[in-house]
């Protein structure tokens, strides 16, 4: 049986960028490449080093929301399958450590 599972995930990454806007753009682009239909919300963008540089280090916290379609008989199995599918999508990226949970 095909089921739609609503999920949300939160993560934090550190990256080098030319400014706040570049850091935001990089994170949003990378997340949308892994999960095109997700809603991306950037929660916090902060410089990790106090002194200014041409290329700065940033820490970005974000939240993702969306639905994942899976094949499963039970709701509990559908949630597990959705989390597994998301972990596979983000494996090998700097976003591989997102904490996932079911919504609703």
Q: PLM ranges: what are they?
A:
Residues 1-61, 65-67, 71-104:
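Long, contiguous binding/interaction regions
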